[in-house]
């Protein structure tokens, strides 16, 4: 929850935690944590805020990129806000399939209010158990499409997505992509936001399809977004974030290669 420049987050790290974060005018983050285990809570918060990794190599490598260069100059401090659990990233992926981002956020929030434990004004992030006990029809009543509801319940019961932290990104992404009802975009969401991996891009994202359509001068297909992200290699996930934010703030112009 963001209010008056302060980001409030609830999550688990040796018990329920509450963190309040604001950025000072000269850049550093000021953090206040309420937790039974402050050190664990701070370490987990660093992951969620994506300040546990230095993305300077990405900024340097693509400073002159025809699509990303201007975005990097204006948004160089941008980092994706990660989820505290992989299960939360999976929920985002399921809710966000083939719908606009705002509608997906509203649906996600509704499901969290329905199923996740409260911690103060906020909800703790979902775990594997959060939706495993629901019947798909209950999630359908809350607004989730039947196919998506079946996918979320099935995976919550049958797959411990938190264990994906222990495997390489390619293995984790392929494991998600193999699941019925998911695909490349869902794999990118889980890898980028749940695992904190930058190698897997958001191929098939509706915003990137729209961007590709503008660049190509025709209706783009999901395969075009994969081609768009391919040059960014191990940074394809972070490039996805910069391209999507950049497209919202200022349209990107076609280049000679697109």
Model-flagged regions — what are they?
Residues 1-258:
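HhH-family (HhH-GPD) DNA N-glycosylase catalytic core used in base-excision repair
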């Amino acid at each position: 929850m963001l209010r008056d420049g302060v980001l409030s987050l609830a999550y688990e790290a040796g018990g329920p935690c509450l963190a309040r974060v604001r950025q000072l005018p000269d850049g550093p983050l000021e953090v206040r944590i309420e937790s039974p285990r402050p050190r664990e809570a701070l370490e987990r918060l660093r992951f969620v805020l994506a300040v546990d990794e230095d993305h300077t190599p990405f900024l340097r490598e693509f400073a002159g990129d025809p699509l990303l260069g201007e975005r990097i100059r204006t948004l160089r401090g941008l980092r994706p806000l990660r989820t505290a659990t992989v299960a939360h990233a999976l929920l985002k992926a399921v809710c966000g399939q083939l719908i606009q981002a705002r509608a997906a956020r509203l649906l996600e929030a509704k499901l969290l209010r329905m199923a996740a434990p409260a911690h103060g004004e906020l909800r703790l992030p979902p775990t594997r158990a959060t939706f495993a006990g629901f019947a798909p029809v209950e999630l359908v009543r809350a607004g989730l499409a039947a196919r998506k509801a079946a996918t979320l319940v099935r995976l919550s019961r049958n797959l411990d997505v938190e264990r994906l932290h222990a495997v390489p990104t390619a293995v984790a992404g392929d494991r998600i992509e193999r699941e019925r009802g998911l695909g490349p975009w869902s794999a990118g969401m889980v890898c980028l936001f749940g695992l904190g991996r930058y190698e897997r891009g958001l191929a098939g994202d509706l915003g990137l399809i729209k961007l590709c359509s503008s660049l190509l001068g025709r209706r783009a297909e999901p395969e075009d977004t994969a081609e768009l992200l391919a040059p960014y290699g191990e940074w394809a996930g972070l490039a996805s974030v910069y391209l999507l934010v950049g497209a919202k703030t200022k349209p990107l112009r076609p280049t000679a290669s697109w």
